[in-house]
């Protein structure tokens, strides 16, 4: 008899057993009255284990059916040629399938109080975590570290990917091949919904913990104990609790000092008080200062300082940091305290190393009588110990720029600049050298006759040019020179011409008047420049000579105060006198504020 292939395939399909979670749940519900410890997941896992052996046994029992199925699906010609044999094989296959159904029912018939032991619970391929019906997070739970193969709970989201032959019932290392995965075990993504029942062992749940979570309701967390003391913790514990209030800081510890407490007490140990006599500080010192020096004072009482050096016997500070005191060159240092007095201006300052002698090749000279008068006056002042401050010696200076420059002396007051209200010369023009050269302010304000002088030099742009009022002008005999300077003019370029003119008239014994608006700045710089060129002096020496004067030959002009710009011009003029390659102006541009001249 010939049987079509389609009918054969229908026969096999109708008799092939189907396995699903619904059938598994029905089997589990029928057996739940007899066995309280079994559940749907255990039945499923036990079925997977028995199914493996069942497939192997069915393969041994009916190899003909498998080969027949393969032959019938791959070769249609053989199926039509052996129609009689197909009927016999179909009957044999139906018997084999009936056998499989009977073995399946027997395998799921679990006796009461009996737990399947074919596979350890730690090697389940799929496991339903406890109490996760409302679990929506994908965070993996805590892994179990127990080594018990029969009763140790296994953390959810652990799947065994090891080969089947290594899944031994009594494996000592359960977590060797486990991988911690993040699974979303929501009800909509799983085929089973029955939760695992609570363990019926003697250990009771430790308690319910309620934590604030971002959700609207507080979810109780059940901690289920087991035989080994390991717990399941609900995954809601992993959620960040909402902060309802700012935690308050504990009260600060009291810092009040008191007697030291006993060793066994829990209070903070406090150091004993140190008396003021040991600390050597006044009662008005702050507490912070007392605490900062307490340890230093304790070390100081036990350390003997080294012996003080001879020069620091009277010092109150550290003997190692006291420099030796300099002795005066006059030998007046007797260990007495040195009284420091402010530097007095005008007549109390001494001016040394000034000479009226000029080099032999110099084009300028003075009369021998004048030099003798300077020397005699100097000797008279030294013998009488007078208060005159100008001392002239016969030492010729090698350079006019060998003094230290102090900028504070030359800072001019603002009221002395461009001010006509100041009268620096109430008694008329000042004699600045041998009654031949005179310094004065604006002659138009002083009501003096300029025709009494042979040379009149006006260096102020504010003063009127009185050349028309100057009578009988003769070159090199009677002249009026007008140079309109301001307080910021570059006067160094004109000083050579002016000083040469002054020296020419001075050598011939003619009277010279030098003036500006006030007679204390621009005209004073002309006189200082003449001193520098005539006597080969530096800026400081020439300035001090004009300011302090000499009782007989030079009147003291203590009101002079040229500004800094004019002082720099005088320094520039001094560099040109000495033929210096680097000018003072260039030096000041690249030098610190304090310089040595």
Swiss-Prot record:
CDD domains: DSP_fungal_SDP1-like (cd14521). GO terms for cellular component: cytosol; nucleus. Residues 55-81, 136-151 have a biased composition (Low complexity). Residues 428-579 form the Tyrosine-protein phosphatase domain. It catalyses: O-phospho-L-tyrosyl-[protein] + H2O = L-tyrosyl-[protein] + phosphate. GO terms for biological process: negative regulation of MAPK cascade. The active site is at residue 516. GO terms for molecular function: MAP kinase tyrosine phosphatase activity; MAP kinase tyrosine/serine/threonine phosphatase activity; protein tyrosine/threonine phosphatase activity. The keyword Calcium does not apply. InterPro entries: Dual-sp_phosphatase_cat-dom, Prot-tyrosine_phosphatase-like, Tyr_Pase_AS, Tyr_Pase_dom, TYR_PHOSPHATASE_DUAL_dom. It comes from the Eukaryota. Keywords: Hydrolase, Protein phosphatase. Residues 107-126, 188-206, 216-228 have a biased composition (Polar residues). Its EC number is 3.1.3.48. It holds the Pfam family DSPc. Residues 55-89, 107-172, 188-228 are annotated as: Disordered. Belongs to the protein-tyrosine phosphatase family. Non-receptor class dual specificity subfamily. This is Probable tyrosine-protein phosphatase. It comes from Candida albicans (strain WO-1) (Yeast).
């Amino acid at each position: 008899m010939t049987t079509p292939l389609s009918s054969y395939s229908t026969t096999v399909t109708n008799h092939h057993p189907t396995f699903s979670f619904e059938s598994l749940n029905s089997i589990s519900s029928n057996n739940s009255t007899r066995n309280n410890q079994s559940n749907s997941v255990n039945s499923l896992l036990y079925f997977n284990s028995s199914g493996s052996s069942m497939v192997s046994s069915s393969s041994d029992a009916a190899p003909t059916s498998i080969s027949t199925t393969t032959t019938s699906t791959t070769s249609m010609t053989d199926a039509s040629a052996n129609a009689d044999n197909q009927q016999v094989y179909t009957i044999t296959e139906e018997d084999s399938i009936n056998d499989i159904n009977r073995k399946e029912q027997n395998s799921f018939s679990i006796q009461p109080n009996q737990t399947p032991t074919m596979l350890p619970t730690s090697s389940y391929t799929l496991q339903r975590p406890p109490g996760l019906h409302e679990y929506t997070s994908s965070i993996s739970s805590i892994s179990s570290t127990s080594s018990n193969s029969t009763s140790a709970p296994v953390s959810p989201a652990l799947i065994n990917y090891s080969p089947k032959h290594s899944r031994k019932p009594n494996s000592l290392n359960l977590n060797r091949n486990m991988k911690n995965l993040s699974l979303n075990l929501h009800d909509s993504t799983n085929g089973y919904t029955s939760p695992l029942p609570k363990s019926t062992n003697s250990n009771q749940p430790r308690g319910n913990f309620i934590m604030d979570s971002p959700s609207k309701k507080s979810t109780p967390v059940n901690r289920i104990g087991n035989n080994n003391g390991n717990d399941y913790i609900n995954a809601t514990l992993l959620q960040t609790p909402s902060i309802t209030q700012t935690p308050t800081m504990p009260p600060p510890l009291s810092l009040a000092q008191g007697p030291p407490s006993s060793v066994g007490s829990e209070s903070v140990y406090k150091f004993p008080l140190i008396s003021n006599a040991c600390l050597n500080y006044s009662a008005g010192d702050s507490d912070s200062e007392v605490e900062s020096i307490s340890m230093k004072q304790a070390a100081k009482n036990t350390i003997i300082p080294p012996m003080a050096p001879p020069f620091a016997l009277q010092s109150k500070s550290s003997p190692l940091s006291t420099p030796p005191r300099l002795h005066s060159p006059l030998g007046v240092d007797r260990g007495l305290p040195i009284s420091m007095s402010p530097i007095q201006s005008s007549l109390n300052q001494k001016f040394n190393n000034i000479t009226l002698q000029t080099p032999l090749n110099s084009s300028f000279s003075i009369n021998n009588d004048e030099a003798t008068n300077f020397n005699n006056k100097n000797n008279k002042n030294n013998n009488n110990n007078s208060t005159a401050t100008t001392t002239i010696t016969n030492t010729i200076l090698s350079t006019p720029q060998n003094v230290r420059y102090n900028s504070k002396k030359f800072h001019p007051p603002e009221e002395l600049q461009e001010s006509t209200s100041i009268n620096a010369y109430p008694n008329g023009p000042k004699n600045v050298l041998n009654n031949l050269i005179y310094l004065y302010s604006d002659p138009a304000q002083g009501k003096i006759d300029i025709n009494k002088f042979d040379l009149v030099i006006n260096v102020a742009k504010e003063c009127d040019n009185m050349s028309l009022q100057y009578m009988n002008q003769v070159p090199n005999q009677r002249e009026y020179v007008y140079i309109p300077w301001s307080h910021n003019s570059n006067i160094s370029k004109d000083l050579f011409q002016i000083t040469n003119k002054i020296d020419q008239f001075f050598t011939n014994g003619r009277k010279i008047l030098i003036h500006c608006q006030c007679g204390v700045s621009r005209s004073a710089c002309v006189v200082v420049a003449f001193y520098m060129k005539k006597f080969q002096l530096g800026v400081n020496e020439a300035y001090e000579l004009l300011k302090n004067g000499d009782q007989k030959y030079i009147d003291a002009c203590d009101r002079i105060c040229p500004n800094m710009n004019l002082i720099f011009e005088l320094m520039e003029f001094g560099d040109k006198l000495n033929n210096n390659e680097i000018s003072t102006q260039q030096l000041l541009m690249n030098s610190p504020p304090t310089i040595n001249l």
